[in-house]
A protein has these predicted regions:
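Long, well-structured alpha-helical subdomains associated
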Residues: 1-44, 195-262
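Soluble non-cytosolic domains of exported or imported proteins
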Residues: 24-28, 72-80, 148-157, 174-182, ...
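Second-shell loop/turn segments in exported
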Residues: 17-21, 67-76, 141-148, 171-178, ...
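Sec-exported extracytoplasmic/periplasmic mature domains
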Residues: 6-9, 35-39, 84-91, 163-171, ...
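Active-site recognition of the HExxH zinc-binding catalytic motif
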Residues: 128, 144-171, 181-185, 189
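Acidic helix-start/capping segments at beta-turn-to-alpha-helix junctions
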Residues: 1-9, 69-71, 94-114, 204-209
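Catalytic zinc-binding patch centered on the HExxH motif and its immediate surroundings
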Residues: 102-127, 134-136
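Acidic/histidine-rich, surface-exposed loop or edge segments in extracytoplasmic proteins
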Residues: 55-73, 134-136, 168
Length: 262
């Protein structure tokens, strides 16, 4: 799976003359195709054509806007904006408050810390270790190839903790087992797609998914697994299963996640 990600198409801008030619797919698209073949056999592979790819791609951005990197540096303000955007998109009755005191995660009575972002069900609080999140969200040297990395490697983990708050609000769901970890990955995929449409936060900032963000998320899910982990930061051993759960969310909706990972 890591090799499939490493040989993804390069990230291009809208004005790039090579855009749209000789495409081989983003990391997410290539992973999806690999998983189709692995689980469903040759018939699933034969069904992949430009129409199927277009339907699966939907509104996910493929190209970067002109003169933009697609990277939103991790700061306290950007973290607050992501959380605000989640609140607008999912409208929970009791939005989880945000804390930047990393020590608060240590005192949670019903969950262990999972830095750089932790969720405490007892207090319905998301706790962020900003320094660790900055490190996770730093883009590696793209000249060297390898796995995708960048801002959404970190933000996808933050989003996953918000999706645990959404699960907690439903009531009756276990948040500290393998099913919870995969359900979180699935719901993180749902939230990621929702961000393909620009969200304006109360402070006037805009949050939107950019080309390359989904690849950064799946790379993080494969390497550190935190966006596909339970409330204690524990994930399933199989990277294939983690990415598959995220893909189910990207291509589905909340109900599908709750039914699939009950």
């Amino acid at each position: 799976l890591a090799a499939v990600i490493a040989f993804r198409d390069p990230l291009l801008s809208e004005g790039d003359p090579e855009a749209g030619f000789d495409e081989h797919g983003s990391a997410f698209e290539r992973l999806s195709a690999f998983q189709f073949g692995f689980t469903d056999g040759p018939s699933a592979c034969a069904a992949i054509d430009m129409r199927e790819i277009g339907q699966r791609r939907g509104d996910l951005p493929v190209l970067l806007p002109e003169d933009q990197t697609g990277e939103l540096p991790v700061t306290e303000q950007s973290v607050r904006s992501i959380i605000d955007a989640m609140g607008i998109m999912f409208s929970p009755a009791k939005p989880p408050p945000l804390s930047f005191k990393a020590s608060e995660a240590e005192g949670c009575p019903d969950a262990r810390p999972s830095p750089p972002a932790s969720y405490c069900p007892a207090t319905n609080t998301i706790v962020v270790d900003l320094d660790e999140m900055k490190v996770m969200g730093t883009q590696a040297d793209t000249e060297d190839g390898g796995l995708a990395s960048g801002d959404n490697t970190a933000y996808s983990v933050l989003i996953s903790r918000y999706m645990q708050a959404i699960q907690h609000a439903r009531g009756g769901l276990v948040l500290d087992n393998a099913e919870a970890a995969l359900r979180t990955a699935c719901l993180t995929g749902v939230a990621t797609v929702k961000m393909s449409k620009t969200v304006t936060t109360p402070d006037g900032n805009t949050i939107a998914l950019t080309a390359g963000d989904v690849d950064e998320a799946v790379s993080g899910i494969l390497t550190n697994g935190l966006a596909a982990s339970d409330v204690n930061g524990e994930s399933v051993p199989s990277g294939f299963s983690r990415i598959d759960a995220f893909r189910v969310g990207v291509l589905g909706d909340e109900d599908r996640c709750f039914k699939r990972f009950a």
